[in-house]
Amino acid sequence: MSLFSRKVVLIEETSFHMGEVDYTKHSLYDNIRSYPMEVKAGKSLYVKISSTNGVDVSIVDNKGYNVKFQEHVTSEFVMGPVPIKEKGTMALILGVFAGDRTDVTMSAWME
């Protein structure tokens, strides 16, 4: 880590519940969430996540390609460094199977 590098928080640490029945959604469950993040080229992206019953985590680049994926994350897990090649919008996508419920805590940052 460089002397002048700084941690830029993209998503503050937050906790929430996933998997509840939601009649407003097409699948009838709140089982997929996406979080867009504005990123800068030349940096690295990190995501810290933990859940009670397992959650699938995907990081998607600004072209729509999956650059990192981890299935069934339960204990505290840091995904990264994921190199950022172009300035733009990347996305963090979280998912659980329909009917599964889990409590999720996550945050994301660039260095």
State the predicted function of each range:
Residues M1-E13:
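Predominantly extracellular/luminal regions of secreted and cell-surface proteins
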Residues E20-K40, S44:
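Non-catalytic, beta-strand-enriched accessory regions in extracellular/secretory proteins
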Residues V55-D56, A98-E111:
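Edge beta-strands of jelly-roll/beta-sandwich modules across compartments, strongly enriched
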Residues I32, G42, T52, R101-D103:
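A general secondary-structure signal for short beta-strands and their flanking turns/coil
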Residues G64-D103:
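Noncatalytic accessory or regulatory domains flanking protease catalytic cores in secreted, cell-surface
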Residues P36-S51, V57, M90-V96:
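Hydrophobic beta-strand segments within beta-rich accessory/binding domains
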Residues E38, I59-K63, M110:
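Residue-level signal for short segments within beta-strands and strand-turn junctions
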Residues L10-S27, S50-G80:
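Surface-exposed beta-strand/loop patches in noncatalytic accessory domains
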